Amino acid sequence: MARDKIGLIGSGQIGGTLAHLIGLKELGDVVMFDIADGVPQGKSLDIAQSSPVEGFDARLAGTNSYEALEGAGVCIVTAGVPRKPGMSRDDLLGINLKVMEQVGAGIRKYAPDAFVICITNPLDAMVWALQKASGLPAKKVVGMAGVLDSSRFRYFLADEFNVSVEDVTAFVLGGHGDSMVPLVKYSTVAGIPLPDLVKMGWTSQARIDEIVDRTRNGGAEIVNLLKTGSAFYAPAASAIAMAESFLRDKKRVLPCAAYLNGEFGVYDMYVGVPVVIGAKGVERIVEIELAGRDREAFDRSVAAVQGLVDACKKIAPDLLDR
């Protein structure tokens, strides 16, 4: 049986890590794309040369042409630039919007049936722009944010309680930024909700609040430590979980930036919510009940995303015609 073909658009730190994980998990053959000549070719060759040691038979190739993505069943997009000192939000949006338009056109032409996962920041705005630019069905285009943010939340909770990360479940909703909403009441340890663990004396509400804040600033914490870059191992692993659920029709319930058109009272926006990912893409949006502070926090997060999308519409109004 032919292996699935996975296109990686962007061959930086996340792109390289994605390629290696795809090989290790035998998810399919990999085509790494980048505009920088030699970079995708060199990285794909380096990873391919690890295959005899690791024992995987996935084929890897590097390219500077979108044509090589033809027939890809999954495309994971990391292309774009990070925000640099002195760069305004609109500067970053303007640059990465152009990238999304180019990437969207390439996917539309050569991989129109692909399941597309966007990682480029600012995430919620870029995945919205990518879907508009590609013209792909909204259920086939998602943003990777919630899996990563929830993983960070789970890790911090497991560390706090000194238990296995496997026994911790958690959901982080909303935009991918400091307005994200870690849902304490829907987070559990072996099925026991966090509020109950506070009552049992396992921790205090003050510690939970600190962990929530650390989760919101999880990406910034790593940037501050690295000084010359940002996270790439955990973001790549998070995107792989999404791709694997699609390729293997696992129907996992994962928090992703998904297109909402009425769900949660949100229209024509990508916002982080729980979804079921299977062979058809986003097969269901899990519209959990939000009330009180959680609803207020979610609405604030949606408003922050709306601000980014509105800025995109002003910078690239032609996207609205697609």
UniProtKB/Swiss-Prot annotation:
Catalytic activity: (S)-malate + NAD(+) = oxaloacetate + NADH + H(+)
Active site: H176
Assigned EC number: 1.1.1.37
GO annotation terms (biological process): lactate metabolic process; tricarboxylic acid cycle
GO MF annotation list: L-lactate dehydrogenase activity; L-malate dehydrogenase (NAD+) activity
CDD domains (alphabetical): LDH-like_MDH
Binding-site list for NAD(+): G10, S11, G12, Q13, I14, G15, D34, N96, I119, T120, N121
Function: Catalyzes the reversible oxidation of malate to oxaloacetate.
Name listed for the protein in its UniProt record: Malate dehydrogenase
Primary gene name: mdh
